[in-house]
UniProtKB/Swiss-Prot annotation:
Pfam families: Mur_ligase_C (PF02875), Mur_ligase_M (PF08245), MurD-like_N (PF21799). It comes from Streptococcus pneumoniae (strain Hungary19A-6). PANTHER family: UDP-N-ACETYLMURAMOYLALANINE--D-GLUTAMATE LIGASE. This is UDP-N-acetylmuramoylalanine--D-glutamate ligase. It catalyses: UDP-N-acetyl-alpha-D-muramoyl-L-alanine + D-glutamate + ATP = UDP-N-acetyl-alpha-D-muramoyl-L-alanyl-D-glutamate + ADP + phosphate + H(+). InterPro entries: Mur-like_cat_sf (IPR036565), Mur_ligase_C (IPR004101), Mur_ligase_C_dom_sf (IPR036615), Mur_ligase_cen (IPR013221), MurD (IPR005762). Keywords: ATP-binding, Cell cycle, Cell division, Cell shape, Cell wall biogenesis/degradation, Cytoplasm, Ligase, Nucleotide-binding, Peptidoglycan synthesis. One of its GO terms (molecular function) is UDP-N-acetylmuramoylalanine-D-glutamate ligase activity. It is found in: Cytoplasm. NCBIfam families: murD. Belongs to the MurCDEF family. Signal peptide: none annotated.
Length: 450
């Protein structure tokens, strides 16, 4: 990693632990900062805080005392999940204390070039695809960021022979200043996380931070299926490389079932190893990045053909007596479920949907669920999802939780059918995150097979 001294002897407050906060605290300590960690979880239930204290780092747990900010901190590094209307952050900003996320730290120390991927849907799959293609081409793509490996941790081991392939959420991108990828990808922009950002325009502004420091020597890969992306083209200094499944563009595009890059066929769409129109978009974004990094077509084709998907993202789980089970727990909004359904014959799909009630109706989903074999509906949003099912003329049953839903879906299916968990809702009404929800689905499928 690069040796930098800008944090040496500076007092830094790390707000919130989890993986990224713990990694940031250790890195800052290594860089000579005087680190204080503040986390809301009580110390006795907080193994990360216990470990940091043993390493000599000051920890304050069990709450977020505002008076802590009366100390003269030069910087706050916040966990990306903590919103900016948190009183600690509001007070820090009022005092003129810069508030960053650990992604900024990763950029500052990284010897490896960075490819950053953000967007509303498809981030993790596209990040993984890019990482696998680059690695197959000998460029060693190191996955990091929102994909589960703290960027500041991976950046410490990356050399200039590697490439940091970094999945970035809007939460993370709100806390960057100098962050400068050589290639950035925005998969799409849809109205999500409005409860965090306050408005769609603020959400887009957070995503757009990915290109703030880019120049004409850098490349910004945008989804020209969206008029919004086309409108944003004039607002960046970077060189824009478009991709589209709807039109021929000066980049990566779909035409007559083939995936092209600037007029050259790379592979057939039906050769991609995972189903769904959204994965065609993800593959096109990957092809654009790969060609910008001089990867040959054969390597791209072989890697994307063998691509098996990502856990919780239209993940094939198992086949029980001819019934296939797919875990798409990551589909926490309507668009993601629409794209998941596009890869299947509705008449053979039993869809499990429902979750956290954010107050939105599901009318947009009606055309996509029309013709489904059956639905199994659960969660806080069940009444709203049932209204959409009624409009679509789809029969449904209700379930109490994911295990119950999985069993009922299997009872409704016959050989040749698909049981698809694609909730179109966040998980927080019942489960800590979409991973827990997806894991319970996987576990129940395993029990059904016994």
């Amino acid at each position: 990693m690069k040796v930098i001294d800008q944090f040496k002897n500076k007092k830094v407050l790390v707000l919130g632990l989890a993986k990224s906060g713990e990694s940031a605290a250790r890195l800052l300590d290594k860089l000579g900062a005087i680190v204080t960690v503040n986390d809301g979880k009580p110390f006795e239930d907080n193994p990360a805080a216990q470990s940091l204290l043993e390493e000599g780092i000051k920890v304050i747990t069990g709450g977020h005392p505002l008076e802590l900010l009366d100390e003269e901190f030069a910087l706050m590094v916040k966990n990306p999940g903590i919103p900016y209307n948190n009183p600690m952050i509001e007070k820090a900003l009022a005092k003129g204390i810069p508030v960053l996320t650990e992604v900024e730290l990763a950029y500052l120390i990284s010897e490896a070039p960075i490819i950053g991927i953000t967007g509303s849907n498809g981030k993790t799959t596209t990040t993984t695809m890019i990482g696998e293609v680059l690695t197959a081409a000998g460029q060693h793509g190191l996955l990091s960021g929102n994909i589960g490996y703290p960027a500041s941790q991976v950046a410490q081991i990356a050399s200039d022979k590697d490439t940091l392939v970094m999945e970035l959420s809007s939460f993370q991108l709100m806390g960057v200043q100098e962050f400068h990828p050589e290639i950035a990808v925005i998969t799409n922009l849809m109205p999500t996380h409005i409860d965090y950002h306050g408005s769609f325009s603020e959400y887009v502004a957070a995503k757009w931070n990915i290109q703030n420091k880019m120049t004409a020597a850098d490349f910004l890969v945008l989804n020209f299926n969206q008029d919004l992306a086309k409108d944003l083209t004039s607002k960046t200094e970077a060189t824009v490389i478009p991709f589209s499944t709807l039109e021929k563009v000066d980049g990566a595009y779909l035409e007559d079932g083939q995936l092209y890059f600037r007029g050259e066929v790379v592979m057939a769409a039906n050769e991609i190893g995972v189903p769904g129109s959204h994965n065609v978009e993800n593959a096109l974004a990957t092809i654009a990045v790969a060609k910008l990094r001089d990867v040959d077509n054969q390597t791209i084709k072989e890697t994307l053909s063998a691509f098996g998907g990502v856990k919780h993202r239209l993940q094939f789980v198992d086949d029980i007596k001819g019934v296939k089970f797919y875990n798409d727990s990551k589909s926490t909004n309507i668009l993601a479920t629409q794209k998941a359904l596009s890869g299947f014959d509705n008449s053979k799909v039993v869809l499990i949907a429902g979750g956290l009630d954010r107050g939105n109706e599901f009318d947009e989903l009606v055309p996509d669920i029309t013709g489904l074999k059956k639905m199994v509906i659960l969660g806080q949003s069940a009444e709203r999802v049932k209204r959409a099912a009624d409009k679509a003329g789809v029969a449904y049953v209700e379930a109490t939780d994911i295990a119950d839903a999985t069993r009922k879906a299997y009872e409704l299916a016959i050989q040749g059918d698909v049981v698809l968990l694609s909730p179109a809702n966040a998980s927080w009404d019942m489960y800590a995150n979409f991973e827990v929800r997806g894991d319970l689905f996987i576990d129940t499928v395993a029990e059904l097979k016994e």
